[in-house]
Structures are given as structure tokens and as C-alpha cells.
Amino acid sequence: MVFKIKDEWGEFLVRLARRAIEEYLKTGKEIEPPKDTPPELWEKMGVFVTLNRYNVPPQTALRGCIGFPTPIYPLVEATIKAAIYSAVDDPRFPPVKLEEMDNLVVEVSVLTPPELIEGPPEERPRKIKVGRDGLIVEKGIYSGLLLPQVPVEWGWDEEEFLAETCWKAGLPPDCWLDEDTKVYKFTAEIFEEEYPRGPIKRKPLV
């Protein structure tokens, strides 16, 4: 895989995400992009910020995850916004408190633009790969997204991944077999803290 995001940029984004959350929890204000932001991070890209509780099994660790699937903001700005939203606006969880940040690991996933999976619906499992792709399912007003790391953490195969993304969208788990359902795939470069406030590493999926 050809990496677009350098390791030092990934480290920059994870540290920025943590600072954005902690400053917002202290002041209620969104921080400005730092003056030393690498110019490449002003390119518009999709990004998600995930907060995981430290030393907890992956299936129960999630504390918040929100982002932008499509490149609508410069990456540095999108990371700040997604970080804050993941901490205080994820409807699945109560807002994060400042003291929790000592026990949360920050993860940033930089996304490629979503690509529509063409062809007959029954061929969709063969056109995706667990450990590489994330998925977006859309039908009517419903949509759902799962990042590439999710099926790896849960041990799903391709069909299970499709079914779970349908479920995330609020649709029946077999909706991926419907021609009216659009399925998109994307890849992500993922960076995470090894432990809260710790060193930052690129996260391999397989």
C-alpha cells in the first residue's frame, strides 16, 4: 500500500485531536489550526476521530467516533471538528468529561474518497477486502459507515461486514443484496496513541 500520510503528519493529527478535545472541554471553544501545520494537511480529506478506553477489549472500548466520510474540509480543520464531535456529540454516549481523557486513547483515520462498488449486488463481497476497506451503505434517507478497523476487531468476513454496515445504517442486514442499495468502499490510514498521551504509531490492520 502506498502511504499518502507521512508518519510525522499522523502524529501531528493525533496530538492535534487530543488538544482540540481537551481545550474544548476546558473552554467550550474550538481551537484554531496551528501555525506549524504542514501545508499538505490543508488539502481537503475525509477523516474520523475515534476515542477508545485504554486496556479494555476492542469490542467494549469505544467511547466516541465521529468524522467526515467525504473531503469537505481541509484535513487539519476536519480533524479538529471531528475530535470535538467524537467527544461531545456522539449520540451513543454521554459527553466525555475532561478527567476521562487520562484514560482514553485517541485514534485518527484519514480516508480516501468513497468509491461506488459497481455490478450485481451478489458480487459485492468479492469486491471488498476485510483489513483494507471501510464501507458506506446508502438507501433512501438511510446511511451507515464502518471504518476498516471495525471488521478486523470483531473478526467478521466480507458478508458479515456488509450486513453490519447495513445494520449501522438502520437497514435490514441483507439490504446489501438490494439493487437500490448503494455500497461504497474506501481505505484509511490510521494513527493511534499506544496509551493515553503516549507515543503515536501507524495502526496496521492485518
From Swiss-Prot:
Gene3D superfamilies: Hypothetical protein ph0010, domain 1 (3.30.700.20), Hypothetical protein ph0010, domain 2 (3.30.1490.150). It holds the Pfam family AMMECR1. NCBIfam families: AmmeMemoSam_A (TIGR04335), PRK00801.1 (NF002000), TIGR00296 family protein (TIGR00296). This is Protein PH0010. Residues 8-202 form the AMMECR1 domain. InterPro entries: AMMECR1, AMMECR1_dom_sf, AMMECR1_domain, AMMECR1_N, AmmeMemoSam_A, Uncharacterised_MJ0810. It comes from Pyrococcus horikoshii (strain ATCC 700860 / DSM 12428 / JCM 9974 / NBRC 100139 / OT-3). Coiled coil: none annotated.
